[in-house]
């Protein structure tokens, strides 16, 4: 076979392989990086100590923030097998949750997870985050690895909870956590402990986007099973997942959950809701998914092209809205100017009428004064 044809065949094979891998794109969140903070409840929590401004690490199930300290390593093959075995159309609440194999962790891995807990605590308390505080309360003797630990913790926060860590004061090294959604999703749907659920929502939106903007319920549950969420099984962060995604998120209009037409027995599917379109975009969701794969959105040409088209349509809609607003403002300004002009004209007319009336009255008064009095008859 000629060399050129071999090269083309290799290229075609590679593209086909990439397409196959993309079919389970979001399932990559079952890797250890996400499993460290997603799969099982933690015995580790941060709480305020009596000394103002200091924090301590305590053991036990109670605490302000409780996230996973047990990493889970789930291979791509095992994830699919688990999903196939666990997904049902309407799983029973007695469904047993598969146990994840322990994933060996070193000291730096432990520090990453502890830093995630610490940052979530600060987010819950609505407090600024300082480098000094992270070094003092979490990093400690591993300060030479601070940047590596912070980078990995930031990735966890983004992929699992949908939070971005941003430095707001480079001189003092002050940071804040910012929700990836534009509006107040966390304030509305966070649980009692203030743990954000934006990452889960972005994951589901990603599944819908990558399945042609409409995902079968089974496809969504396959991905959620991979990251440790099962219908009917109470989750330590998200509560009962089925209620969350088929009721809460639907009620808040982030998701649309509908029966597939003419399906017997009934089957259901998910679409983006109007608030999802308003508060995020296909490009933002694709950027989120790309980070899961440690790549860039353009690595997925078909979805990237669709996201670019969506961005262009949004830009045109914003431009049209601005033009409409400007036209309305201009019309109101003209109306006000016209009304003001009419007011001035009417006022001038009234003033002239008053002047004319006063002039006539003055003339009459003078005329009366100049007429001599009639003499009395004797």
Swiss-Prot record:
InterPro entries in alphabetical order: MAGE, MAGE_N, MAGE_WH1, MAGE_WH2, MHD_dom
GO cellular component, one term: nucleus
Biased composition (Low complexity): 64-77
Stored Gene3D superfamilies: MAGE homology domain, winged helix WH1 motif (1.10.10.1200), MAGE homology domain, winged helix WH2 motif (1.10.10.1210)
Domain MAGE: 108-307
Key words, A-Z: Tumor antigen
SMART domains: MAGE (SM01373), MAGE_N (SM01392)
Chain positions covered by the region annotation Disordered: 49-105
Expression (tissue specificity): Detected only in the melanoma and testis and not in other normal tissues.
BP-aspect Gene Ontology terms: negative regulation of transcription by RNA polymerase II
Protein name as annotated: Melanoma-associated antigen B10
């Amino acid at each position: 076979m000629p060399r050129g044809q071999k090269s083309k065949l290799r290229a075609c094979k590679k593209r086909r392989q990439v397409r196959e891998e993309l079919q389970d794109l979001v399932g990559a969140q079952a890797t250890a990086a996400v499993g460290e903070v997603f799969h099982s409840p933690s015995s580790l929590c941060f709480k305020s100590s009596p000394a103002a401004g200091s924090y301590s690490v305590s053991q036990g199930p109670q605490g302000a923030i409780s996230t996973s300290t047990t990493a889970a390593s789930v291979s791509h093959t095992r994830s699919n097998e688990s999903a196939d075995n666990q997904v049902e159309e309407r799983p029973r609440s007695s469904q047993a949750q598969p146990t994840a194999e322990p994933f060996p962790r070193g000291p730096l891995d432990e520090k990453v997870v502890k830093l995630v807990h610490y940052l979530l605590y600060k987010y819950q308390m609505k407090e600024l985050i300082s480098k000094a505080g992270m070094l003092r309360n979490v990093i400690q003797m591993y300060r030479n690895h601070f940047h590596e630990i912070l980078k990995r913790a930031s990735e966890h926060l983004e992929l699992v909870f949908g939070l971005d860590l941003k430095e707001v004061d480079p001189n003092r090294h002050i940071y804040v956590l910012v929700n990836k959604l534009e509006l107040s999703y966390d304030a509305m749907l966070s649980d009692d402990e203030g743990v954000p659920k934006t990452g889960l929502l972005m994951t589901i939106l990603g599944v819908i986007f990558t399945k042609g903007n409409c995902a079968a319920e089974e496809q969504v549950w396959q991905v959620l099973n991979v990251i440790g969420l099962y219908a009917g099984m109470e989750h330590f962060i998200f509560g009962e997942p089925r209620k969350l995604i088929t009721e809460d998120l639907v009620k808040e209009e982030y998701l649309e959950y509908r029966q597939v037409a003419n399906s017997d027995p009934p089957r259901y599917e998910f679409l983006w809701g109007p608030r999802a379109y308003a508060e995020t975009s296909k490009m933002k969701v694709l950027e989120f998914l790309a980070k899961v794969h440690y790549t860039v959105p353009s690595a997925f040409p078909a979805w990237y092209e669709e996201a670019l088209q969506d961005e262009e349509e949004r830009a045109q809609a914003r431009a049209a809205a601005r033009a409409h607003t400007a036209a309305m403002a201009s019309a109101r300004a003209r109306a006000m100017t016209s009304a003001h002009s009419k007011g001035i004209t009417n006022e001038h007319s009234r003033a002239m009428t008053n002047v004319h009336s006063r002039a006539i009255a003055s003339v009459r008064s003078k005329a009366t004064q100049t007429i001599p009095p009639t003499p009395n008859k004797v």
